Amino acid sequence: MLDIMQIQEILPHRYPLLLVDRITDMEVKKSIKGYKNISISEPAFQGHFPGHPIYPGVLILEGMAQCGGVLALKSSDLTDEEMKEKVIYFMSIDNAKFRNPVRPGDRLDYELTAVKMKSTLMVLEGKAYVDGKLTAEAEFKAMIVDK
């Protein structure tokens, strides 16, 4: 649906903090699915943890948040040009839970559902999976603001 080049047209993030490789499904104002391929060459694995690489939970949350940012911006009434002048600020991440570790070689699937969307404010429920197994979940509150 959206490849990495299209995602970069929407999100301001770049390597090493662009944490969504592809958007696979999106229903505007309702839900989004995307993923990140986790490689041993991820910068986080230099220190988390040598000899026992585990993808950091905070980066799982950031990847979910970035997927949510794509949904929020694509669900807004902004033109593509107006969208380039906006950014998503996350106001809170609640009820974050980490269920299973994510390791190099995994494909980390993100699924987010809009609980509430009002012009520039939104509440999203996010879940992350590896091989269909829940790895993390959280509730995100965010807003669209000018850069």
Curated annotation (Swiss-Prot):
Involved in unsaturated fatty acids biosynthesis. Catalyzes the dehydration of short chain beta-hydroxyacyl-ACPs and long chain saturated and unsaturated beta-hydroxyacyl-ACPs. It is found in: Cytoplasm. GO terms for biological process: fatty acid biosynthetic process; lipid A biosynthetic process. HAMAP family: FabZ (MF_00406). GO terms for cellular component: cytoplasm; membrane. It comes from the Bacteria. PANTHER family: 3-HYDROXYACYL-[ACYL-CARRIER-PROTEIN] DEHYDRATASE. Pfam families: FabA. Belongs to the thioester dehydratase family. FabZ subfamily. Keywords: Cytoplasm, Lipid A biosynthesis, Lipid biosynthesis, Lipid metabolism, Lyase. The keyword S-adenosyl-L-methionine does not apply. This is 3-hydroxyacyl-[acyl-carrier-protein] dehydratase FabZ. It comes from Aliarcobacter butzleri (strain RM4018). It is an enzyme of class 4 (lyase). The active site is at residue 48. Its main location: cytoplasm. The keyword Lipid metabolism applies. Its EC number is 4.2.1.59. It catalyses: a (3R)-hydroxyacyl-[ACP] = a (2E)-enoyl-[ACP] + H2O. GO terms for molecular function: (3R)-hydroxyacyl-[acyl-carrier-protein] dehydratase activity. InterPro entries: FabA_FabZ, FabZ, HotDog_dom_sf.
